[in-house]
UniProtKB/Swiss-Prot annotation:
This is Iron-sulfur cluster assembly SufBD family protein MTH_1150. It comes from Methanothermobacter thermautotrophicus (strain ATCC 29096 / DSM 1053 / JCM 10044 / NBRC 100330 / Delta H) (Methanobacterium thermoautotrophicum). Pfam families: SUFBD_core (PF01458). InterPro entries: Fe-S_cluster_assembly_SufBD (IPR055346), SUF_FeS_clus_asmbl_SufBD_core (IPR000825), SUF_FeS_clus_asmbl_SufBD_sf (IPR037284). Belongs to the iron-sulfur cluster assembly SufBD family. GO terms for biological process: iron-sulfur cluster assembly.
Amino acid sequence: MLRDTLKKAEKAREKKALYGEDIDLEKFIKEEAGEHEEVTRAKEVPKEVQETLLRVGVDPEERERAGTFIQVDQSGICTTCASESIEIMGMNVALDKYSWLKDYMWKAVAVDTDKYTATTALREAEGEMGGYFIRSKPGAREVFPLQACMFIGDERVMQTAHNIVIAEENSELHIITGCATGEDVSSALHVGVSEFYLKKGARITFTMVHNWAEQVEVRPRTGIMVGDDATYINNYILTSPVKSIQSYPTAYCTGENSRVVFQSILGGQKDSVLDMGSRVILEGRGSSAEMVSRAVSKDSSQIYSRGHLAGRVPEVKGHLECHGLVLSDDSMIYAVPELEGSATELEMSHEAAVGKIAEEEVMYLTSRGLTEEEAASMIVRGFLSMDITGLPPELAAETKRMLDMSLKGM
């Protein structure tokens, strides 16, 4: 099996991605694992790193957190776990501990998807395994979230990570992931492969905040397998400048009455190119999906907002919604909603709208004493501050705090 995987990866080494600008991987440094010193607690990382972690929802003090994983460049430097109902560890550790884990690798994401997945697999074969393993035990319902951070601290580094998350039957798991760069980093590449497996009756909420440097390129590759009566909720926030990001996670609702929700908040600034979307394949009877995105473009940014709902069996439901605000003549939002139905008795719909700030709203706020700039900023923040559904009250409040912090620059 490993040999077949590596053969596929080798053949796809130069394979361009379907979407997004092609990246020359040779211009980045392939740093070895173990280059950074390990710490026993998150609060032991340098002060300037702690401040960056807070901006992406990762608390160095680990207050109300069930566990923590931090990867700097290619090195897993911190792993803690405060709960007996879940497991969190580096993938290199998990593969040594569990021989069965390799059976989950490259099942939700094909290794030959493109050059980025292929490069991740080839680096793994060379011993440069990055990423985390998270598992909730059967019946476990952890109240506090786990937190994970992918941090790039060195210039021109290529960071690869292969994450696997397993929610066993009737378990519930909440994860906050923050991705960021150090203050001295201007350019780098992050490639994150993430595979989620939700067993019968399981539930995962996954909230991700990105805060990259202006010349960082980002290529996440994500697949989600959703079993009977399972629910996966994904919240994504990006409002800081980045050179380019291209992400198109795909969820497979193979289980009966399975459910998937994708909610994205995108703020394009400066020369950023954001090619974002999500795809849900509804293959189990009674399965459903909801995909909602809010996008704002300013300066000379470009946003491609994609969504694809595919109903393959009867009695499935799906809704796709994309709303965008264009704030400058040099910026652009390109909405691409797709509905695909290949069975009877299904319900799928989409709603897309791209426009500008309403002048009457600005006039109303300026009449109340705000400047035009303050009024526009308030309207934008209100537009992007959509309600994040599906979270426990404590985590919903934490997510709102993370969102408010992200929107300060908009």
